[in-house]
Amino acid sequence: MTPPLVPGFDETFNPYPSGPDGTGDLEQAKAKLAECGQPDGFSMNLAYVNQGLGPDLFASVQQNLGRVGIKVGGAANDGSSYYSTWIGSPKNIIDQKIGIAIAGWGADFPTAYGFWQSIANGNAILDEGNSNYPSLNDPKVNDLLAQLTKEGDKAKADDLAKQLDQQVMANAVYLPVQFDKTFYYRNPRLTNIYLNGGVGNYYDYVNVGTGGK
C-alpha cells in the first residue's frame, strides 16, 4: 500500500495475490466468501465520483466482483462534496450501504506518518471531512503511528514504517489499484520555477518569471 517513494514501501510484500496472471484468483475468492458465511456472494454499493474516470472505475469493479457473486450497486456523487460529506462522513457510508469507496491519496510529506496519519489513525476519525474512509481503529496501527512521531533513528523508523504498512494491510480495508506519476513540463522561457511542498508539490506560480532562453 505504501507508495514507492515513502518509507515502508516493500515491493515483495503482497498479502493478497491476485492469481498468476494478475486477473484474480477466483477459487481463493470463493473460498474466502464461504469462510465468512457468504458462499453465494452478497450485495453492496460502491462510491465513486460521477465524472471523469469514476463511471469507468465503477463499471470495472462491478464486472470483476460479479464473477464471484458479489453484486455491486452504484453510490455516485458530485466531486464537489464527495470527499467532505459523501465518503468523508462515516454515517453516510453506513446509510448508503457503501462497501467500497474509490479515492485518491498522497502524502503531504514523504514520510510514513505523513502518508498514514489521516487515513489510518483511529484517533483522527471525523464526522465530516474524514479521510479515514473505512473508519479503521486498530490499536496496533494507532500505536505504531504514535511511535513514529517519537523515533529519531532512521533505521528504526523505517522498520516501524514497514510494520505499519503490514498491519494496515492485515485489516484488508484498503486496496491499492494505481500509483500515479505526473509529468511536469517546464517551458525554457520560464525562470524561478520550482515545486513547492507547501502547496502539494505543485509549481509555485507566485514566483514564476519569464526571460529564460
Question: Over which residues does each language-model region extend?
Answer:
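Structural transition elements
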Residues: M1-K32, L53-D56
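C-terminal amphipathic alpha-helical "assembly" element
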Residues: Q62-G73, T191, L195, Y202, ...
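Proline-centered turn/helix-capping motifs that create local helix->coil transitions or kinks
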Residues: M1, F109-A112
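Extracytoplasmic/peripheral linker and loop segments enriched in polar/acidic and small residues
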Residues: G22, G73-S84, D95-Q96, G104-A107, ...
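Long, contiguous, secondary-structure-rich segments that constitute the structural scaffold
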Residues: L33, Y205-T210
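Ligand/substrate-recognition segments at binding pockets and active sites
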Residues: K30, A34-A107, Q117, Q178-T182
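A structural "hinge/loop" feature
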Residues: G129, Y184-D204
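Short, solvent-exposed loop/turn and secondary-structure capping segments
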Residues: L57-F58, A112-F115, R189
